Amino acid sequence: MTKGILGRKIGMTQVFGENGELIPVTVVEASQNVVLQKKTEEVDGYNAIQVGFEDKKAYKKDAKSNKYANKPAEGHAKKAGAAPKRFIREFRNVNVDEYEVGQEVTVDTFEAGDIIDVTGTSKGKGFQGAIKRHGQARGPMAHGSHFHRAPGSVGMASDASRVFKGQKMPGRMGGNTVTVQNLEVVQVDTENNVILVKGNVPGPKKGFVEIQTSIKKGNK
């Protein structure tokens, strides 16, 4: 069955394995996870738990900052006996009988050796050209060339008379939802509420990430 938890990427470091191998790891802090709602096949058509992460400030009238919860979010969290949460995600295909509304989900949900998928938001790179954004080849860098980093042809002239949808062109790069699959949990530190994940995960330091059992290898 699927397991999941929400957290923040702290940064990267390295640890030694039992065989002396040096392993690069990403440190993910995963505290304040609370089950806000249980969904079942009988009522909702599928099994899932809804998990909230990171407290928001209580509702405040006329508050314009998103640090404050709105009334519906505050009421939803109140049913679970929890503070309103900034991030809320669902994890499907879980054993809902193992969870109760209001229960805290801790890092010991996972253990060393588990294979997981990590979802985050990639670093924003701003407006970039086709070479950096899409990996296109550049033109000749010789003195006589007129095209060094230009994107080249974007379509036909008289026949199509338009640029087709999906044409790779310069534009804003990064800031996308990215999932890295089949990463390994190297270590779980229950004292500090952190999980050490082998390799790197999407996003900058302090970026929000979602960890769940690998969809390809986790249930074998």
Swiss-Prot record:
From the record, give the cysteines joined by S-S bonds: none
* Annotated PROSITE patterns: RIBOSOMAL_L3
Q: Can you supply one Gene Ontology CC term for this chain's record?
A: cytosolic large ribosomal subunit
Ribosomal protein listed as a keyword: yes
**Keywords, sorted A to Z:** Ribonucleoprotein, Ribosomal protein, RNA-binding, rRNA-binding
The cross-references to PANTHER family, in alphabetical order and at most eight, read:
50S RIBOSOMAL PROTEIN L3, LARGE RIBOSOMAL SUBUNIT PROTEIN UL3C
Q: Fill in the subunit field for this protein.
A: Part of the 50S ribosomal subunit. Forms a cluster with proteins L14 and L19.
* Protein name as it appears in the record: Large ribosomal subunit protein uL3
Which organism was this protein described from?
A: Staphylococcus haemolyticus (strain JCSC1435)
What high-level taxonomic lineage is stated for the organism? Bacteria, Bacillati, Bacillota, Bacilli, Bacillales
